[in-house]
């Protein structure tokens, strides 16, 4: 009842343009091309304004380069010690001098091998395989019995 009333209200309140069942096919076939073309008649789209576009692109590139320089070159002062940090992180001589950490590394050879999960997985696989074999065997048996009954 509720669904019927919702559908009825939908049909009553739907306008022909917004969700109505009456579709105006001729309105769909009309093509609206080049409406408001004059709004695009600016200096950015003219052939004569190549110099303006090139200047804008040059300003963008200069600004991006300035941002990169500020971030990576000019601000790497003595207080940030960027070069020292790079040497510590990436030099081969500092590999022996590792910093101490409270986290223990994951070394696979020294890890205790737990066999209990593998036992559980093998028992589960064995039971699953047994169930599949049992159901196939039972299905064949019932199929053979029904064939025998139909022959009698």
Curated annotation (Swiss-Prot):
Domain of life: Bacteria
Composition skew (Polar residues), residue ranges: 66-80
Keyword flag Glycoprotein: no
Keyword Transmembrane helix among UniProt keywords: yes
Spans annotated as Disordered: 62-83
GO cellular component terms given for this protein: plasma membrane
Positions in the Extracellular compartment: 136-152
Keyword line: Cell membrane, Membrane, Transmembrane, Transmembrane helix, Virulence
Intervals, Cytoplasmic compartment: 1-114
Places the protein is found: Cell membrane
Pfam families: EssA
InterPro entries listed in its UniProt record: EssA (IPR034026), EssA/YueC (IPR018920)
Topology versus the membrane: Single-pass type I membrane protein
Main localisation: membrane
Bilayer-crossing regions: 115-135
Function as written in the Swiss-Prot or TrEMBL entry: Component of the ESAT-6 secretion system (Ess). Required for the secretion of EsxA and EsxB.
Protein family according to the UniProt entry: Belongs to the EssA family.
Protein name: ESAT-6 secretion machinery protein EssA
Natural source organism: Staphylococcus aureus (strain COL)
Lineage of the species this protein comes from: Bacteria, Bacillati, Bacillota, Bacilli, Bacillales
């Amino acid at each position: 009842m509720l669904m019927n009333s919702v559908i009825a209200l939908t049909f009553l309140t739907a306008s022909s343009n917004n969700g109505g069942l009456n579709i105006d096919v001729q309105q769909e076939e009309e093509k609206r091309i080049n409406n408001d073309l004059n709004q695009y008649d600016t200096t950015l789209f003219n052939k004569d304004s190549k110099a303006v576009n090139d200047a804008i692109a040059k300003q963008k590139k200069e600004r991006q380069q300035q941002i990169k320089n500020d971030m990576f070159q000019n601000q790497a002062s003595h207080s940030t010690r960027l070069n020292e940090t790079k040497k510590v992180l990436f030099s081969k001589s500092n590999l022996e001098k590792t910093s101490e950490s409270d986290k223990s590394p994951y070394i696979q050879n020294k890890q205790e091998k737990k066999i209990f999960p593998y036992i559980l997985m093998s028992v589960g696989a064995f039971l699953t395989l047994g169930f599949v074999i049992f159901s196939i065997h039972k299905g064949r048996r019932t199929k053979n019995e029904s064939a025998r009954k139909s022959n009698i």
